Amino acid sequence: MDAFRRQASKLRDQVAKQQLAVIKQFSGTGYESSDVMVIDELEMQRHHQLDKLYRSTRSAKEFQRDIVKAAEAFTTIGLRHIEAGTKLSEDCCRYGNENSQNIDENILAKAAAIYGDARKHVDKEQEDFNKLLASQVLDPLRAMVAGSPLEDARHLAQRYSRMRQEAETHATEVSRRQARVREAPIPENVAKLQLAEAKMQELKANMAVLGKEATAALAAVESQQHRLTFQRLVAMVEGEKNYHLRIAAILSDIEAEMVTEKQHKESAPPAIPTENGSEKTSYFLAEVIHPFSAASEKELDLDKGDYIVVRKVSQTGWAEGECKGKAGWFPMAYIEKRQRLPTTNFAAEVY
């Protein structure tokens, strides 16, 4: 009966250990942490170092995946920007072409044509940025996440972890055999103890070799992870910075060209209307108070002090007149109305 109880107790212990091992295998991270000293202090330090390296490489791998996901999202958004930008560019160019007959007078058609042509450069910058993300960020990080050096190093650490668990279990077995020899030092118990101790020595030797190999492999992978990920992160930041700078420069040029066209239209003299016999024009004399340089053939050069015969005044602030035998347009703000010429000598200059 006692032998049966001991056998049942031993069976329960074995089942409990197996259940614990299964739970650890499926609930753990791949490398099991433990504060139990299996062999000595040196092995304990290596175990803690491997645990730290395993967690560090796993964290770096997850961070690399996060960067890859972000870069993939940037690329997808960029493709949508290109699609929307291409459609807008086509719409702007079409509107400008449909209203090209009077494009100099239609500032909206002119602005649409300017933006439609320049928008192609914006889309080209987006394409270049997407290519940079693929070659400088996505491809290198994907290769490292799925690379064999990382997996090989982690497998070594996992093998060491399993071997350490085996050694921890076997150390308990050695202690049990030692206690049994003390209780009954018969040859059979002594032989079993010697076998258990020999196996323990073999486990210690194998752990020493495997521990060094796993530590070196994980340390090398950790260093490579940090170095490569830092380089790819810097490349992504630099590429995004340059992308936004070039986009800003293109948009600044577009804006400046639009504003210039608007200012030119607002400051340009009005078109000369077709006159008919029934139209009456009021003439008056004016003196130039500010010099004016003509910017086109329709405009008139003026020097301060000149006298001019004003023939037409438009609602845009421009006037048409004649001075020194030449006719053209000029800003009304540059002249003042006079009742008569100061001397007869000036009359010849006017006409």
Swiss-Prot record:
SMART domains: SH3 (SM00326). Keywords: Coiled coil, Cytoplasmic vesicle, SH3 domain. Detected in all tissues except seedlings. Residues 31-267 form the BAR domain. InterPro entries: AH/BAR_dom_sf, Endophilin_SH3RF, SH3-like_dom_sf, SH3_domain. Residues 281-340 form the SH3 domain. This is SH3 domain-containing protein 3. It comes from Arabidopsis thaliana. The gene is SH3P3.
